[in-house]
Amino acid sequence: MKAIDKKIERFARYLQRQNNLDHIQFLKIRLGLQVALGNFFKTIVTYGVALLFHTFLYTLITHLTYFFVRRFAHGAHARSSLLCHIQNLVLFVALPWSIVHFQVSWTFMIFVAFIAFIIIICYAPSATKKQPILPHLRKKKKRNAILISICFLVLMLFVSEPYMQLIALGMCIEAITLLPIFFSKEET
């Protein structure tokens, strides 16, 4: 990992020199590159494991639902990169596989989706210390999180099993990250 960090550092310095950037701008670029590369590797690992377990489509549906709601609702993050990898594998590979394999009832998953929707209404958007939400954006993000959730609830009525359950799972995973129990007093 240190070799990758050195390459990122070198590339960020190159961009700093080429574009005459100050130190703060350099730090932002370096952080952006680190986050982008880290997310790329997490995606490769998650979807690679999903391919190995023949759950690629299930993982994709659950992950996309989660992503589209999270885009506006925000929510808690894993405490470390390793924990993030583990959570990704459990939440986006093992859980979708379990829902399909054990044929979780669609009525139960609709109930779960409505509970998730209520949590989204109550707690979205949920800012963190590292990702604060500007006050003038809060209302718009809340509205968009609710609207995208309604779209998914309606979509659930028109898709077959197990896709309906996977959409509900994606909403539920995101809703759980909004709960106040995941935020310390200093984080909010």
UniProtKB/Swiss-Prot annotation:
Its main location: membrane. The chain crosses the membrane at residues 49-69, 82-102, 104-124, 163-183. It is a multi-pass membrane protein. It is found in: Cell membrane. It is an enzyme of class 3 (hydrolase). One of its GO terms (biological process) is quorum sensing. Keywords: Cell membrane, Hydrolase, Membrane, Protease, Quorum sensing, Transmembrane, Transmembrane helix, Virulence. One of its GO terms (molecular function) is peptidase activity. The keyword Chloroplast does not apply. SMART domains: AgrB. InterPro entries: AgrB (IPR006741). It comes from the Bacteria. GO terms for cellular component: plasma membrane. Its EC number is 3.4.-.-. Belongs to the AgrB family. Essential for the production of a quorum sensing system signal molecule, the autoinducing peptide (AIP). This quorum sensing system is responsible for the regulation of the expression of virulence factor genes. Involved in the proteolytic processing of AgrD, the precursor of AIP. HAMAP family: AgrB. This is Accessory gene regulator protein B. The gene is agrB.
